[in-house]
Curated annotation (Swiss-Prot):
Phosphorylated at Tyr-14 by ABL1 in response to oxidative stress. Homooligomer. Interacts with GLIPR2. Interacts with NOSTRIN. Interacts with SNAP25 and STX1A. Interacts (via the N-terminus) with DPP4; the interaction is direct. Interacts with CTNNB1, CDH1 and JUP. Interacts with PACSIN2; this interaction induces membrane tubulation. Interacts with SLC7A9. Interacts with BMX and BTK. Interacts with TGFBR1. Interacts with CAVIN3 (via leucine-zipper domain) in a cholesterol-sensitive manner. Interacts with CAVIN1. Interacts with EHD2 in a cholesterol-dependent manner. Residues 149-160 are annotated as: Interacts with SPRY1, SPRY2, and SPRY4. This is Caveolin-1.
Length: 178
């Protein structure tokens, strides 16, 4: 309670002191009010995206970073004409660049829609089905684990303790006979 009045069993009226930090809805002190105002709310729908660095987490560094030299290489001693090599390089690079752009413009939005739906369903199932099932299972298994623990302590602990005492009295002596 963050302030108020109550009557004790003898009929005395007491006022409760207001907590120094206030409650969670209306902070009482200025420090908490400033902290709450400083926190900026980030909306996933309005955040800015980086158009220069489009892979900030480096997901595709070793997968799709394929250049001309990674695909086509002429070993020492078997070289084509320099003009052919330059034209091949240009053709490969430009074709890869523009065909990727064409494919991403035609198929990118539908695939993004499909992946968005997929991850929305996955998030929904995880939040509303998986986590509650796991919590429910842990609550149920806790009862079983207590019963199991009692059984182990009741039946197995004395048995293993007795076996330990039996084997603790075994003495081995080695003699070397010449």
């Amino acid at each position: 309670m963050s302030g108020g009045k109550y009557v004790d069993s003898e009929g005395q009226l007491y006022t409760l002191p207001i907590r120094e930090q206030g409650n969670i809805y209306k902070p009482n002190n200025k420090v908490m009010a400033e902290e709450m105002n400083e926190k900026q709310m980030y909306d996933a729908h309005t955040k800015e995206i980086d158009l220069v660095n489009r892979d900030p987490k480096h997901l595709n560094d070793d997968v799709v970073k394929i250049d001309f030299e990674d695909v086509i290489a002429e070993p020492e001693g078997t070289h084509s004409f320099d003009g052919i090599w330059k034209a091949s390089f240009t053709t490969f690079t430009v074709t890869k660049y523009w065909f990727y752009r064409l494919l991403s413009s035609l198929v990118g939005i539908p695939v993004a829609l499909i992946w968005g739906i997929y991850f929305a369903i996955l998030s929904f199932l995880y939040i509303w089905a998986v986590v509650p099932c796991i919590k429910s299972f842990l609550i149920k298994i806790q009862c079983i684990s207590r019963i199991y623990s009692i059984c182990i302590h009741t039946f197995c602990d004395p048995l293993y303790e007795a076996i330990g005492k039996i084997f603790s009295n075994i003495r081995i002596s080695m003699q070397k006979e010449i």
